[in-house]
């Protein structure tokens, strides 16, 4: 086995979505450290068991929204009640002078390997490890775990699950134009 991983042991015995995310992230780290990259994959779960696994390959940024809409339709069709998304991503601090600048375009961006688990019931879990590149050498920093947060990518899933808008979404700063300010 290329990665030293037993596929039968990739998922958590507990069947809990957060435990699945942690277990899958350990595997993703091994794959990344072996290959120097990780493809974007999503696993849909029902009652703690994986029922759908797919690679997502957006051609451009706008395709991500369409892919998540299709994923939500599939989740609804097969009765998925949770999802784990594993991917590489860019992150950057907000720039008040350029509020619409994407992280990939920021000079202050960092690259991360991430896993985000969401479910019909319960809070999301986000795992991340900073990608450290030195020429051809690549390694990952320690894993950081965060429960909660505003993971807008999953809005289409929340919609089909009829999940209330998370409170974390209301706590975000409002736009610089005053819209939404009281």
Spell out what each predicted region is.
Residues 1-71:
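N-terminal domain-onset segments
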Residues 1-3, 74-182:
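Low-complexity intrinsically disordered segments
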């Amino acid at each position: 086995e290329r990665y030293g991983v037993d596929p039968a042991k990739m998922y958590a015995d507990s069947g809990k979505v957060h435990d699945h995310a942690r277990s899958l992230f350990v595997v993703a780290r091994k794959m990344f450290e072996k290959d120097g990259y990780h493809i974007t994959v999503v696993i849909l779960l029902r009652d703690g068991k994986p029922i759908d696994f797919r690679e997502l390959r957006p051609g451009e940024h706008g395709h991500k929204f369409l892919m998540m809409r299709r994923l939500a339709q599939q989740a609804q069709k097969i009765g998925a009640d949770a999802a784990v998304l594993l991917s590489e991503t860019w992150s950057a601090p907000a720039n008040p002078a350029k509020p619409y600048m994407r992280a990939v375009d920021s000079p202050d961006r960092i690259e991360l390997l991430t896993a985000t688990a969401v479910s019909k019931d319960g809070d999301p879990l986000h795992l991340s490890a900073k990608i450290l590149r030195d020429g051809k050498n690549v390694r990952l920093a320690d894993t950081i775990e965060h429960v909660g947060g505003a993971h807008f990518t999953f809005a289409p899933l929340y919609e089909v699950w009829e999940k209330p808008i998370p409170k974390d979404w209301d706590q975000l700063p409002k736009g610089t134009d005053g819209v939404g300010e009281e």
